[in-house]
Structure formats: structure tokens, C-alpha cells
Amino acid sequence: MIATLERREGVSLWERFCAWITSTENRLYIGWFGCLMFPTLLTATSCFIIAFIAAPPVDIDGIREPVAGSLLYGNNIISGAVIPSSNAIGMHFYPIWEAASVDEWLYNGGPYQLIVLHFLLGVASYMGREWELSYRLGMRPWIFVAFSAPVAAASAVFLVYPIGQGSFSDGMPLGISGTFNFMLVFQAEHNILMHPFHMAGVAGVFGGSLFSAMHGSLVTSSLIRETTENESTNYGYKFGQEEETYNIVAAHGYFGRLIFQYASFNNSRALHFFLALWPVLGIWLTAMGISTMAFNLNGFNFNQSVVDSQGRVINTWADIINRADLGMEVMHERNAHNFPLDLASGDVLPVAFTAPAVNA
């Protein structure tokens, strides 16, 4: 018997690091995108928690009227928020080193930019990490494609909309009531409820919820029983089993008779692709709608579109919505402008037909 001895080539530290980063055997996959995702998301999360608890008031409108958003300044979980950067900063990149002091940076809302930019980098890297892990495991890339919808939505409200409006102060506040305020002001300024892409997004989200509930209830109702009546049907499933866990023929027959035959899928793969596609497509369209309205390509305007034979306006729901929009428009940033643009854009009306006589 002959034994052959070979000198083992040394593996460099960099090669071992690369193997560890890209290994699918780790309990938590890191990946090259993870090298960017973990630090950015940790930074955004840490800054958000600190700012939500203790950040001082921010001069959001740039008119020396600070708005308090943190818990230590009198807010609660519902009313609290990280206030967007000041309108005095606009779209300027505003890291800590650009301010004269940390106090100035906090007063002008610097934490908002720090959180938003790190968050967007983090979620984009998370999306890339999904693709990377799918590639390593030989899977198809649809998980990454589906997650692109919420990434597009977040990018629209946190980055594209401020770019279009010219200031980070128009971005969505990082809080519950701040989100509601953003929605109301968005409706007042852009009539988003009358935008077709927003309508598609509503159909996507609510339709996706409906289809998810329908699919889950159909599957749960047609499970193949593997247990006794005294045991949970969940115990009849073994992880990784090859057999079907529910009777798709029974589910197809039930739903086909409940609605009509062709409303029911007879292909499980096509069904699940549809369940993924519907909400993703809706959220994509909503993000596109926000991005177009960012540059003031607004929703449909049907105001005063119905008149009688005498030319008098017959109000429709469009006019009712417009009246609500005007109310929200004049109420927000009430000290930032003395004459809102929407109210100043009508025809000039004469206040006197003749000039008064002036006696010398």
C-alpha cells in the first residue's frame, strides 16, 4: 500500500472570511448584502429609538416654531414621532458634521435624515440579501421581487416625495399620528383618493387580504385528517412530508360551485403565483402614484364639472371632497403661509365697479 502525502495549501484569512460570509450553513445567513444591511439597520433603529424617546423639538417649517415629537417632551406612543428635517434645510444633505453643533443638528431635525437614509439602504440591502440567499440555495428569485414592492413604497414616501416637493420636511414623519397627518395633507395637496394608481393600490391591499383569507380558510377546511377527533388536525402534518396536506380537488369543487367554475384555480402553482402577484402589483402602482404626485401630477379633478342650464354648479361628491381638501389645506402649517396656494389660484374678483371720487 502506497500513501501519498501532499502539502496542504494554506487558506488565507480573507478566503475564510468570504466562505463564512457566503455560507448557507450559518444559523443566520449574512451574505455580502448583509455586510451593508446589518450596520445600516442597526444604526437606523438605534437612532430612531433614541430620537423617539428624547429628541428635542424640531423647527420643521423653518419659521422658528419648533414641534415636539419625543416622549420626554410630552408625547405618548400615539402622538410621538421623529419629526422630519427643517424646511430651512430643504433637500441639502445634513449629516452631523455639517452642523455648527449637535444642538443645531437636533433643532433642524438631523436625526430624521440619518434614520431615513440608513433605513432605505438597509431595506434595499435586505432585498438584495433575499436574492443572494435564493441564488445560493438554487431557488427562484420571486421572494426578492415581491419584497421590492414595500421597498418601492418606503422609497416613495421617504425619498422620492421629498425630492419632488423640494424638502425633507415634506417626508412622512416617523410616528403614528405623524403618518395620519402625512396622509391628510397628501390628500389636501394632491387629491390622492382620485388617483387611479392609488385606487389600484387599495384593490391590491384589500384584495390581497381577501384572497389570503379565502385561500387559508379553503385549505384549512379541506385538510386531510390524519388524527383522531380528540386531537388537533395540526398534529397530522409532518414537516417535509411528501403527501398533500389538503385536498385541492375538494377545495376546487367547493369554490367552483360557490362562485362559478372558472373562478377557482385547478393549478396550485398558478394559484400561489396569483396570490403573490396581486398585492405586489397594487403596491407597485401605489408607489408609482406617490412618485408621480411628488412632482404634482395629481389625482383627477372633477370639481364643478356638473352645471345646470343657467350655468349654476350642481355639487357632486368631487366638490364635497374638494371642500374637505381646502379645509385640510388651510389648517396644516397654518403659520407657514398666510394665503394658501389653492385658495389664491382662483379668478380675480372685482371688489368695486367704480373708483370713489377723490376731492382735492
Curated annotation (Swiss-Prot):
Binding positions for a quinone per the UniProt entry: H215, S264, F265
Annotated site residues (Stabilizes free radical intermediate) in this chain: H190
Amino acids binding [CaMn4O5] cluster: D170, E189, H332, E333, D342, A344
GO CC list: chloroplast thylakoid membrane; photosystem II
Enzyme Commission designation: 1.10.3.9
Alphabetized NCBIfam families for the sequence: psbA
Function recorded in the entry: Photosystem II (PSII) is a light-driven water:plastoquinone oxidoreductase that uses light energy to abstract electrons from H(2)O, generating O(2) and a proton gradient subsequently used for ATP formation. It consists of a core antenna complex that captures photons, and an electron transfer chain that converts photonic excitation into a charge separation. The D1/D2 (PsbA/PsbD) reaction center heterodimer binds P680, the primary electron donor of PSII as well as several subsequent electron acceptors.
HAMAP family associated with the record: PSII_PsbA_D1
Protein name: Photosystem II protein D1
Source species: Thalassiosira pseudonana
